[in-house]
UniProtKB/Swiss-Prot annotation:
The keyword Cytoplasm applies. This is UPF0298 protein BH2594. The keyword Cytoplasm applies. It is found in: Cytoplasm. Pfam families: DUF2129. HAMAP family: UPF0298. InterPro entries: DUF2129. NCBIfam families: PRK02886.1. Keywords: Cytoplasm. Belongs to the UPF0298 family. One of its GO terms (cellular component) is cytoplasm.
């Protein structure tokens, strides 16, 4: 199975009754009733076109992209905690 890179976006709505219509643009991961937003995942290649389509709807207040693909997850100077090192050596 071939997997594609996906990117998340938060779509803020005026009313949650329109959340169901967003399924045709990607995978609806989460719907917040209190804050009225939907977390939507779509292919990375189609992010810009999907974002433009979503912003054209009357029920969409705002669309924000997830910055997770751009955040560095490997740290260069990550040092282990000294207290944890000694805990593992207690039994030896």
């Amino acid at each position: 199975m071939l997997t594609s890179n996906r990117q998340g976006m938060a779509v803020y709505l005026t009313s949650l009754k329109f959340a169901r219509q967003l399924r045709r643009f990607g995978y609806v991961h989460y719907v917040s009733k209190k804050m009225r937003y939907v977390v939507l995942y779509c292919n990375e290649e189609a992010v810009q076109t999907t974002m433009e389509k979503l912003q054209s709807f009357h029920f969409v207040k705002d669309v924000q992209l997830s910055m997770r693909p751009y955040v560095q997850t490997e740290f260069q100077n990550a040092k282990p905690d000294k207290a944890k090192e000694y805990d593992y050596k207690m039994g030896l």
